[in-house]
Amino acid sequence: MAATMFRATLRGWRTGVQRGCGLRLLSHTQGPPDYPSFVESVDEYQFVERLLPATRIPDPPKHEHYPTPSGWQPPRDPPPNLPYFVRRSRMHNIPVYKDITHGNRQMTVIRKVEGDIWALQKDVEDFLSPLLGKTPVTQVNEVTGTLRIKGYFDQELKAWLLEKGF
């Protein structure tokens, strides 16, 4: 009997919980404690709204003359009447990017192409052929709406798309 009591005492000592003390205290509690009431203030919510991120990127401000000092230019107001359309990125830039794969394969990617992407490929090939002296190697992905061109032509293609009105 003494050994059993000694083991029970050690068990309580190891876990830090004495036998039977938790149930007795829980049964004698009253209802929920009375907390002080609160006042809902909508005047200070403007400070919270400043911390919340914007749900969409605002439209760029109107400028007196274009291109702006950063080089940004808005798209032409009536969009060009072409069988394809190149939508701007969410930051209102032309979606033409450089891409490098396998360590040395340099590609230019035109994203967000809607409509007849094959007509865009033909126009890009017609535009780049005099610059290269040969027809550039291109890859069309109709599902994602991207056109990949072998080589770095991002600045030339951005200027060409701006000239077309995108």
Swiss-Prot record:
It is found in: Mitochondrion. It comes from the Eukaryota. GO terms for cellular component: mitochondrial large ribosomal subunit; mitochondrial ribosome. GO terms for biological process: translation. Component of the mitochondrial ribosome large subunit (39S) which comprises a 16S rRNA and about 50 distinct proteins. Interacts with OXA1L. Belongs to the mitochondrion-specific ribosomal protein mL49 family. The lineage of its organism: Eukaryota, Metazoa, Chordata, Craniata, Vertebrata. Coiled coil: none annotated. InterPro entries: Ribosomal_mL49. This is Large ribosomal subunit protein mL49. Keywords: Mitochondrion, Ribonucleoprotein, Ribosomal protein. Residues 56-78 are annotated as: Disordered. GO terms for molecular function: structural constituent of ribosome. It comes from Pongo abelii (Sumatran orangutan).
